[in-house]
């Protein structure tokens, strides 16, 4: 399926040569387009379940939603994963472990924050022992709201991450442009 909003397809060469059946583009744009497409359709998330949101995260891997058919395969090791799904209440004691696991992931790496506790502290926001959002520890690409969010909401968040990777608008590209 061709996305008509792609920057590769909407450049001046595509507009002028579309009717002739071929496309002229820069080689680097084509390589970026293909690599982003491949990355977005083969996500390997690592679960970082901390509370009740982890149960909903497990539902997405079960037979009803079956993320395997979308190219999403859960991994147990951070060295094999490229997506971290943080689900649940992040405490001050667990924050260094989250950062350590995030640092062990290979580039490019993405983070999905799942649930109101991971997004901003949730119900325990005013507790002395709770981090008020995992984005204070690791850069987050997608926020999935809810308490707990449904499996459909996480599935939608994964689809949004795939679209974001296709556009090239993720934390890995933001970091390289800031240097």
Swiss-Prot record:
- Give GO cellular component annotations, separated by semicolons: plasma membrane; respiratory chain complex I
- Which principal EC class is assigned to this enzyme? translocase
Output one GO MF annotation: quinone binding
Enzyme Commission code: 7.1.1.-
Q: Which cofactor does it need?
A: [4Fe-4S] cluster
**What does the note accompanying the cofactor annotation read?**
Binds 1 [4Fe-4S] cluster.
- SUPFAM superfamilies assigned to the protein according to its UniProt record, in alphabetical order: HydA/Nqo6-like
Which Gene3D superfamilies does the record cross-reference, listed alphabetically? 3.40.50.12280
Question: What keywords are annotated for this sequence in UniProt?
Answer: 4Fe-4S, Cell inner membrane, Cell membrane, Iron, Iron-sulfur, Membrane, Metal-binding, NAD, Quinone, Translocase, Transport, Ubiquinone
- Domain of life according to the entry: Bacteria
What the protein does comes down to:
NDH-1 shuttles electrons from NADH, via FMN and iron-sulfur (Fe-S) centers, to quinones in the respiratory chain. The immediate electron acceptor for the enzyme in this species is believed to be ubiquinone. Couples the redox reaction to proton translocation (for every two electrons transferred, four hydrogen ions are translocated across the cytoplasmic membrane), and thus conserves the redox energy in a proton gradient.
**Which proteins does it associate with, and in what oligomeric form?**
NDH-1 is composed of 14 different subunits. Subunits NuoB, C, D, E, F, and G constitute the peripheral sector of the complex.
User: Which PANTHER family does the entry link to?
Assistant: NADH DEHYDROGENASE, NADH DEHYDROGENASE [UBIQUINONE] IRON-SULFUR PROTEIN 7, MITOCHONDRIAL
Under the heading NCBIfam families, the entry gives: nuoB_fam, PRK06411.1
Family the UniProt entry places it in = Belongs to the complex I 20 kDa subunit family.
Q: What is this protein called?
A: NADH-quinone oxidoreductase subunit B
Species annotation: Ehrlichia chaffeensis (strain ATCC CRL-10679 / Arkansas)
As recorded in Swiss-Prot or TrEMBL, the protein's gene is named nuoB
């Amino acid at each position: 399926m061709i996305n008509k909003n792609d920057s590769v397809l909407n450049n001046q060469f595509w507009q002028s040569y579309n009717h002739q059946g071929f496309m002229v583009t820069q080689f680097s744009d084509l390589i970026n387009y293909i690599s982003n497409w491949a990355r977005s359709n083969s996500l390997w998330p690592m679960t970082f379940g901390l509370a009740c949101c982890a149960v909903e995260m497990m539902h997405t891997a079960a037979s009803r939603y079956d993320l395997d058919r979308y190219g999403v395969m859960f991994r147990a090791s951070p060295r094999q994963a490229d997506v971290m799904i943080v689900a649940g209440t992040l405490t001050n004691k667990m924050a260094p472990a989250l950062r350590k696991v995030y640092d062990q992931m290979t580039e490019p790496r993405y983070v999905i924050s799942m649930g109101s506790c991971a997004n901003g502290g949730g119900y325990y926001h005013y507790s002395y022992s709770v981090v008020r959002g995992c984005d204070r520890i690791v850069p987050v690409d997608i926020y999935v709201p809810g308490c707990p969010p449904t499996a459909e909401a996480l599935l939608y968040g994964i689809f949004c991450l795939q679209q974001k990777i296709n556009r090239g608008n993720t934390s890995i590209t933001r970091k390289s442009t800031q240097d």
